[in-house]
Amino acid sequence: MYLQELQLQQFRNYPTAKLTFGQGINVLLGENAQGKTNLLEAIYVLALTRSHRTANDHDLVNWQAKTAKVSGRVVKAAGAVPLELTFSRQGKRARVNHLEQARLSQYVGQLNVILFAPEDLAIVKGAPTVRRRFMDMEFGQMNPRYLYNLSQYRTLLKQRNRYLKDLQHKQNKDLLFLSVLSDQLAAFGAEIIAQRLAMLQKLEHWAQAIHGEISQQREELTFHYATQVADDQLTDVPTITAALSALYAKQQDKELYQGTTLVGPHRDDLHFQVNGKNVQTFGSQGQQRTTALSVKLAEIDLMKEETGEYPVLLLDDVLSELDDARQTHLLTAIQDKVQTFITTTSLSGITRQLIKDPTIFHVAEGTVVADAVDSDDPAASKED
């Protein structure tokens, strides 16, 4: 899978842009605040219908416009697929092969991307919400059923929390409807937990091999999914469902007092351990970075295993955060395998021997010009 072309209309600081990319490494070169990250964001949005930088879609629209459009052409083993997203005050519309999609969940998965930015180091050392979002975004791309379960769960969670708030102000509390919501939430929550466990087991397999190579077999990386459901109950969906229902009943008085749901996958966490110790708490900065790099590279192999296609890799100013050894491992791992987009202010910090025939894009004040350095790729012709 690779992104052949990208078109922008009134997206961020780009009134208009049309770019054709190489199948290998594409370097977005320019000073800070010129629009390099905006281009990566556009690719990310084209894949997932949402930004990794803002929760407000209005931020994506050029301040002089009312509507923004991101479109592209994705080439897969089965052929080329045109994609299009339109953002306006009325919401967003998604098209695949020029056909509007009734639900965004039907759209996600047409273009798979993996983003690695400096803030992704927070996967290891950040708050639990960062790791939950990581699981939801990545597993949702690979598995439409996961995305569906997550959507249903979030809808029910909002409804249940709203009802818990309402019950705080009532003398006679109708707990029957709360019980119905709890049962429904437990069912979808169990599906999510079971799917997370299955995907994490596969991701751990790939990450362990990569982490072992980087650490020269001195360290072993393991994952631990932290949930209030007891380990011996994490066997199958019905057992997890029953366990969640029991936890809701146990926590009912506390939830009524606080007016929020205290149990479920929205409260779970993922712990990374090196040689049996939690990297977040006891790991050095080097171990934390090696863990983050191992996990991101493992995503590439897992996505290929799950979807049959390699994803597009987005490296947003992350090479400057890696030492020479980790940078070498990263660039060697993706060479000739994954279409990659790299943002940087200078090529001097990149080991050029590890970048084969890159397509270079010069970015300045929302204008992009492409040329080639030692490349015969037709995508390297100059283009505004």
Curated annotation (Swiss-Prot):
Q: Which domain of life is it from?
A: Bacteria
Q: What terms describe the molecular function in GO for this protein?
A: ATP binding; single-stranded DNA binding
Keywords recorded for this protein, A-Z = ATP-binding, Cytoplasm, DNA damage, DNA repair, DNA replication, DNA-binding, Nucleotide-binding, SOS response
- Coiled coil: which residue ranges? none
Q: Does DNA damage appear among the keywords?
A: yes
Pfam families xrefs: SMC_N (PF02463)
User: Binding of ATP: at which residues?
Assistant: 30-37
- One Gene Ontology CC term in the entry: cytoplasm
Q: Which InterPro entries match?
A: DNA-binding_RecF (IPR001238), DNA-binding_RecF_CS (IPR018078), P-loop_NTPase (IPR027417), RecF/RecN/SMC_N (IPR003395), RecF_2 (IPR042174)
PANTHER family from the UniProt entry: DNA REPLICATION AND REPAIR PROTEIN RECF
Similarity annotation: Belongs to the RecF family.
Function summary: The RecF protein is involved in DNA metabolism; it is required for DNA replication and normal SOS inducibility. RecF binds preferentially to single-stranded, linear DNA. It also seems to bind ATP.
Recorded hits in NCBIfam families, A to Z, give: recf
Q: What is this protein called?
A: DNA replication and repair protein RecF
Q: Give the encoding gene's name.
A: recF
